[in-house]
Amino acid sequence: MEINSPMNEKVKNWAKLQQKKYRDQTGKFLVEGEHLIGEALKAGAVEQLLIEAGRTNPFEREKEAIVCGESVMRKLSANVSGAWLIAVCTQKTTAPAGLRTVVLEGVQDPGNVGTIIRTAVAFGFDHVLLSPDCADVYNEKCVRSTQGALFHIAISRTELIPALNELKELGVTVIGTALQGAQPLSELPVSENIAVVLGNEGQGIRPATLDICDQRALIEMSSFESLNVAVAAGICLYRYRRCG
């Protein structure tokens, strides 16, 4: 099968996935690049694989590709220069409750969200829980920032306070990052079943959410008042890492 017209109905529908509302409606999203698509294939998330005419499919054994003209690939790519390999992927429909959870409240930058997801996988967490006002996980910038980790961790989006209370009932210790009324992170006990809460880039964690945290963690620094949220996440998650 070969598609050469950007006006093809399939192409029009794929192009709509560049918009969040269509990603939400269909449960699908676009992924570009050989590395990310390789990770998606490992997770069984690739529905359709699109390749530019004249190119060799690096995943020929795993997935047959639909050959597309350059103009089609440019229309579907988020990059100005286009992409030669694009996958239409399915979003995860279930996210099992994890006892090692990273919780994001109001984190707006998709690059930060993606970097935190990547860090969570690296340090052995099994669930990322996002508030409804966080950046879209399936935004192209976020997907790229995860470097494929998106496909290897449970992800869910819901109201945080009920979800955190459920985790606490399961015996999970909930730790929120804070600047006031907090103990140094290095002095807090290490727990296996842990939920680390990180807040909005400018405002931090909302008071109501912070109130239900079991502990408040302060990252000790010399002079600066705060860190980028993705950097703060890396420090906190390393503290509670699970290796192997």
Question: Which role does the model predict for each range below?
Answer:
Residues 1-55, 134-135:
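Boundary-proximal intrinsically disordered activation/regulatory segments immediately upstream
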Residues 2-5, 66-69, 153-163:
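Short acidic-hydrophobic, aromatic-tinged amphipathic segments that line or gate anion-handling sites
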Residues 33, 108-116, 227-232:
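Amphipathic alpha-helical repeat scaffolds
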Residues 65-90:
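Glycine/small-residue-rich loop that forms an oxyanion/phosphate-binding "nest" at active or ligand-binding sites
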Residues 68-69, 105, 131-132, 154, ...:
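Short beta->alpha connector loops at strand-helix junctions that form conserved
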Residues 87, 122, 137, 142-149, ...:
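Structured adenosyl-cofactor binding patch, chiefly the S-adenosyl-L-methionine
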Residues 90-180:
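RNA substrate-binding interface of SAM-dependent RNA methyltransferases
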Residues 176-224:
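Active-site/ligand-binding-proximal alpha/beta "capping" segment
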